[in-house]
Amino acid sequence: MAEITSAKAMARTVRVSPRKSRLVLDNIRGKSVADAIAILTFTPNKAAEIILKVLNSAVANAENNFGLDKANLVVSEAFANEGPTMKRFRPRAKGSASPINKRTAHITVAVAEK
């Protein structure tokens, strides 16, 4: 049986746009966990807070479920998929209304040993 060397965590239906999430995820992909945490801590972005939580969850999964060492972990996968869109309307002039799409994302972060 092969030894498990990776763990992942997901946050589903998060109220942040997947497009904006990807901008932050691109910064941490391939980095060590310590570097990724430092980057996310100082990124002034709503998505960064959520991604930091998911990253910490993935690290905890690796340590508790698979006995991996945090010092050797690298962010192997980081991606955001589109979640369900909440459709809303904004009232406009002359009794009309404009549609507003409030987008959500499914964020996945995977960590693996070097």
Swiss-Prot record:
<comment type="subunit">
    <text>Part of the 50S ribosomal subunit.</text>
</comment>
<protein>
    <recommendedName>
        <fullName>Large ribosomal subunit protein uL22</fullName>
    </recommendedName>
</protein>
<dbReference type="InterPro" id="IPR018260">
    <property type="entry name" value="Ribosomal_uL22_CS"/>
</dbReference>
<dbReference type="Pfam" id="PF00237">
    <property type="entry name" value="Ribosomal_L22"/>
</dbReference>
<keyword id="KW-0694">RNA-binding</keyword>
<comment type="similarity">
    <text>Belongs to the universal ribosomal protein uL22 family.</text>
</comment>
<dbReference type="GO" id="GO:0046677">
    <property type="term" value="P:response to antibiotic"/>
</dbReference>
<dbReference type="InterPro" id="IPR001063">
    <property type="entry name" value="Ribosomal_uL22"/>
</dbReference>
<keyword id="KW-0046">Antibiotic resistance</keyword>
<comment type="function">
    <text>The globular domain of the protein is located near the polypeptide exit tunnel on the outside of the subunit, while an extended beta-hairpin is found that lines the wall of the exit tunnel in the center of the 70S ribosome.</text>
</comment>
<dbReference type="InterPro" id="IPR047867">
    <property type="entry name" value="Ribosomal_uL22_bac/org-type"/>
</dbReference>
<dbReference type="InterPro" id="IPR005727">
    <property type="entry name" value="Ribosomal_uL22_bac/chlpt-type"/>
</dbReference>
<keyword id="KW-0699">rRNA-binding</keyword>
<dbReference type="GO" id="GO:0019843">
    <property type="term" value="F:rRNA binding"/>
</dbReference>
<keyword id="KW-0689">Ribosomal protein</keyword>
<keyword id="KW-0687">Ribonucleoprotein</keyword>
<comment type="function">
    <text>This protein binds specifically to 23S rRNA; its binding is stimulated by other ribosomal proteins, e.g. L4, L17, and L20. It is important during the early stages of 50S assembly. It makes multiple contacts with different domains of the 23S rRNA in the assembled 50S subunit and ribosome.</text>
</comment>
<dbReference type="GO" id="GO:0022625">
    <property type="term" value="C:cytosolic large ribosomal subunit"/>
</dbReference>
<dbReference type="InterPro" id="IPR036394">
    <property type="entry name" value="Ribosomal_uL22_sf"/>
</dbReference>
<dbReference type="GO" id="GO:0003735">
    <property type="term" value="F:structural constituent of ribosome"/>
</dbReference>
<dbReference type="GO" id="GO:0006412">
    <property type="term" value="P:translation"/>
</dbReference>
